[in-house]
Amino acid sequence: MYSLVFVILMCIPFSFQTVYDDKSVCDSDNKEYMGIEVYVEATLDEPLRQTTCESKIHKYGASVSNGGLNISVDLLNCFLNFHTVGVYTNRDTVYAKFASLDPWTTEPINSMTHDDLVKLTEECIVDIYLKCEVDKTKDFMKTNGNRLKPRDFKTVPPSNVGSMIELQSDYCVNDVTTYVKIYDECGNIKQHSIPTLRDYFTTKNGQPRKILKKKFDNC
């Protein structure tokens, strides 16, 4: 009995130390670790095609192709990278999620200086382009590549950068909703965290709750 208690007590400090070592990256005085999540919901003019999901991650951006639609995201003046791409499809709609991972779980990590962080809050642009990968001679071609006009445009507070999102859509896209979140990855560890930045764009009325609840499969 006593030996069992001794073993348990010996293991507890080791467990705490392991967690602390994993997250000690957050103790840096001259680096900030920011994460990003970008959600896209795009509804096409016709049911989705049966295609194989393909994704690519490159420096300061990523793209995913599925259902006859390619969604590409480029991060300009954000100093951030994506590490995962997820997708979900339903009838005529493609849902995509681009996200980074915590700094203690992956390399390379999204680290930046304080000067970079200031530039991010002032100049970060999330450039989203929706490109159709279906036959353009089909009768359902409507907008001929023109940019969608938003019926409802708003930022989701708190946001101190105004609109971060720039979006351009191809001819087959009927409606689109996008949501961007940039957050302090060490926010739950540090005493003072950096405020989260959020932005939201949609061509239809509503909030992005539906898009956030979808189950995304890695692509």
Curated annotation (Swiss-Prot):
Transmembrane segments: none annotated. It is found in: Secreted. Belongs to the orthopoxvirus OPG170 family. This is Protein OPG170. Glycans are attached at residue 70. It comes from Vaccinia virus (strain Western Reserve) (VACV). Keywords: Early protein, Glycoprotein, Host-virus interaction, Inhibition of host chemokines by virus, Secreted, Signal, Viral immunoevasion. Residues 1-16 form the signal peptide. Coiled coil: none annotated.
